[in-house]
Regions:
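Low-complexity acidic/polar repeat-biased segments
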Residues: 1-2, 71-140
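Acidic, glycine-rich calcium-binding repeat modules characteristic of RTX/beta-roll
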Residues: 2-5, 10-68, 80-90, 141
Length: 141
């Protein structure tokens, strides 16, 4: 698996490459997840520095979600799998899109999990969250 390290500045990152780990390094980074991620791609996001945001753009279609104590796995409707490690280091922005100047509904990791039907993050293992949903406006539908 390849790793793409971004800068120490505030980067806008649009993950799309299969078999790639994206690292923002320093700075307040924004990761944009959309339906443009290739079918069956495997993507990992890790960023432990800065105030980082995962934006799930309007129309993103998600087949399943899985939550662990500090990670989330999103399986998109096209079979792509996006794993976010260190998820407590991120805010989650439903409907946001920095490239379009759009702000969505922002929550921390626990709030994002709750919005996906997980009332409490597990201390070990993982639990399933929402499935067969899409981002409509600033909410799951």
């Amino acid at each position: 698996m390849a790793t793409i390290n971004h800068s120490s500045g505030a980067d806008i990152i649009v993950p799309s490459n299969n078999g790639t780990t994206y690292r923002g390094l320093g700075g307040d980074d924004t990761y944009i997840l959309s339906n443009s991620i290739a079918a069956n791609a495997a993507i990992t996001i890790v960023d432990t520095s800065g105030a980082n945001t995962i934006q799930l753009v309007n129309g993103l279609s998600v087949a399943s979600t899985k939550f662990a104590a500090d990670a989330v796995q999103l399986t998109l409707s096209n079979g792509a799998v996006v794993t976010i490690n260190g998820a407590s280091n991120f805010d989650f922005d439903l409907g946001g899109n920095a490239t379009a100047g759009t702000s969505g509904s922002v929550s921390d990791f626990a709030g994002f999990a709750a919005g996906a039907g997980v009332s409490a993050l597990p201390s070990s293992g993982s639990v399933a969250g929402a499935s067969n949903v899409s981002v409509q406006g600033t909410a799951w539908s």
